[in-house]
Amino acid sequence: MGLLEVKNLTKTFKGKTILANLNLTVNAGETLVIIGKSGAGKTTLLRCLNLLERPTSGNLTLGNNTYDYSRLTAGDIRTIRDQLAIVFQNYALFNNKTALENITEPLIYGQHQTKAEAQKTAQTLLEQLELTDKANLYPTELSGGQQQRIGIARAEALRPSIILFDEPTSSLDPALVGTISRDILSLREKGQTMIVVTHQLDFAQRIATQCAFLNEGHLVEVAPADQFFTHPAQPETVAFLNAAKEAEA
């Protein structure tokens, strides 16, 4: 059994099927990268996993607990969200809080740590990211890459079972893509389980242990990263990868 297992996850909206009977297993320590065209349902899948959007039906097994998406209690939702931290594409930092406060406040108010405990955790993470000198700056004083890295630090500080990343490099220049790649690889070395949505093949190949192709709400293929990129099994995957490589060339 994986750390996370999703069975028959379906999401409909106004009569349209956005995600169709998805089955997915993520093992502890894996970095699953989900790729696909714009509108394929990648971000919706992340939001459904974190319950920012409620799936219409399906089941989730997280650790030793299994949940029916159609019968979640308020306690179930809190438990799931505590284990699945999400790093948003637009960073989602509080502009009226410093970089340090953006990391510490979820620890103080969400996990009931003391201010001293939260600050120690945040300062350690900022030091690892070589962002100690940015601790007292506000998001508007930080570059996009720095904001993204603060978002990553905030997610790591919560010590979730899994960190979800929504297009973490989509608005960054190539040099910063390399920095974010190294940050994610560092998390992987620590044993952190991650699910990453991206449309950038080079980035996906750098960080993935497993890769999945989502197309029009259907999970077409899931395979180890080396196999996925060198010997994809499904014709749809082959066509997508060839088109994406041509576009990036």
Residue ranges and their predicted role:
Residues 67-85, 115, 231-232:
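ABC ATPase NBD coupling module
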Residues 174-176:
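Helix N-cap at the start of a conserved alpha-helix in ABC-type nucleotide-binding domains
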Residues 50:
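Helix-to-loop junction immediately C-terminal to a conserved catalytic motif
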Residues 138-142, 146:
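Conserved ABC ATPase signature
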Residues 157-161:
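A short, proline-enriched helix->beta-strand linker immediately N-terminal to the Walker B motif
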Residues 163-166:
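Catalytic Walker B motif of ABC-type/P-loop ATPase nucleotide-binding domains
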